[in-house]
Each structure stands twice: as C-alpha cells, then as structure tokens.
Amino acid sequence: MKHLLGLEKLSRDEILSILHLAAPMKDIILREVKKVPTLRGKIIGTLFYEPSTRTKNSFELAAKLLSADVVSVSVATSSVKKGESLKDTVLTLEAMGIEAIVIRHSRNGVPAYLSSCSKASIINAGDGQHEHPSQALLDLFTIQQYKGRIEGLKVLIVGDIMHSRVAKSNIYGLSKLGAEIIVSGPPTLIPEEVKNYAQVEYDLDNAIKKADVVNVLRLQLERQEAGLITSLEEYHRFYGLTKERMAKAKEDLLVLHPGPMNRGVEIDEEVAYCDKSAIQEQVSNGVAVRMAIYYTLMGGREE
C-alpha cells in the first residue's frame, strides 16, 4: 500500500492488517518508554488547509513516537498564501526529502489528485465531505478492542450522514468487516444512497434498542442556518444521545464520538463520560492507529 486515501478502495484484508498492527502500537503508547526507532531517518510533512487540533496533533505525535521527523507546514504563512498551487507545495516538500504527507482539505478528492503527481505517500486526514479514513480505522479498532469482534455487530451511526466524511468512511469499513449498519437522523440529513449499505431508522428511540455500538456524529451548527434542521433544541430532542435514551439501550452498548463534541446538542455530557463511553479511549487509539498507518505505508522496520 502506497497511499491512504479512503476506506472505499481498501480491501477487507488491508483494513484488518492496519487494525492488527495498531494493537502493538497501543502497547508502545502505554509503556514507560514510548519511543521506538522504527521510522528513524524518515521525514513526514503535515499540511492542513482546514483547522484541526486533535487530528493534526495525533498524526504528529504518532510520527514522533516512531522516531520520524515532522515538518508542519503553516498554510497561513506559507507560499500557499502567495498563490502557490497545491501540486507545487507538495512537490516542493517532496524535493526536500519528505516521504509522506498528511493532508486535510475542504475539497473532495484533493488527496487522490496529489497521489497521482507525487512520489511521497499521501495520507488523507479528511477531504471535504468525502472520507476521513484514519478516524474510521480508529473507530473500528476501538469497537474491536471493546467487543472482541466487528462482524455481526449492529452499529448505529447518528446524525448528519449526508455531509459527514466520518460517516462515509465508517460505513465503508463496517460493511467490509461484516457489521450490520443502522443510520438515524433527520430525513434532510440522510442521503438516499446510504440505503445501499445501511438500514435507515428515523426514530432514534427505536434504533438505539437494537444497537451494540452507537457512533454519534458531531453536528455542524451551520446546518441550522442552511435550514436542514429546525433548531438545535429540536435536534437534541429527537436525535441527541441523552440519559433517558441510554436507559432504552442494551446493557453493554458502546458509545463513540469522533470529537469535538457539541455537548447538549448531539450528546449530553453525562452520557459522554458514562461507563459505556469509549470517547477518551478513541483519542489514544487514534495515535496507535496512525502509527500503524505510517508503518504500513513507509516500510517500518523492527530494530
């Protein structure tokens, strides 16, 4: 595997290989001496055209724990602001010896385009409304860690399925690993084509009774301005994960959220930090999974 552009094109075996590698990477994070020399001498660049805290930091920490050097390009002060094209920026980084580039961009397909014109490995950290593969992989790893399997589980995804790159990558990954997918949200935020992959259930109170795992998507607040939801209060009433809704769920329900959370909108704080929640674990699992991605793409070696 040369690039990580999305889960739609990955095979089941490629997904499972990354999840398998993430387990020993998690062990590294938990031990006293966290750094290993696996990617010593390698250089990784991060190029974020959209604001990011946790994803950018997670990718950079993952690289450093594998002993790679990291070059973080500040888009706000770089040649990009002077009119340099994306292609020129990436080829310049490549000419400096950078071997992998982590990119986030607001336009669909940018990582795929760059992979066609660069010798460096391109890692998609989120492109428009298309995909967010590393987030889906860490979600899959977290489910596997808590449930021991993915195949046969009923996984409920709640929220704005239409615009969410997290939802799309999760749906591709879950379907390839044999999960039964249920989606729930306002009709205005559920695309027709999702019915090819998932059962659509507009009544969250009914959907949550069936679920083994619930992944609550962050609601982009501009959806209200666009008229796709009536109000945040109404969204919370019908699709917020509340303590009252949790009482209807299975005893061993697993709660996930990609973060950052809008508390009191898509999820209540007491649910986010309840004993069924693995939201904090997702953060540490994200570092482990991104270490596994680097190892897969950059020919990691054991020393």
Curated annotation (Swiss-Prot):
Xref: SUPFAM superfamilies: Aspartate/ornithine carbamoyltransferase
Gene Ontology CC terms, in alphabetical order: cytosol
Disulfide bonds: none
Binding site for L-aspartate: 82, 165, 218
Gene Ontology BP term (one): 'de novo' UMP biosynthetic process
Organism superkingdom: Bacteria
Subunit architecture: Heterododecamer (2C3:3R2) of six catalytic PyrB chains organized as two trimers (C3), and six regulatory PyrI chains organized as three dimers (R2).
Protein's recorded name: Aspartate carbamoyltransferase catalytic subunit
Organism: Coprothermobacter proteolyticus (strain ATCC 35245 / DSM 5265 / OCM 4 / BT)
Record lineage: Bacteria, Pseudomonadati, Coprothermobacterota, Coprothermobacteria, Coprothermobacterales
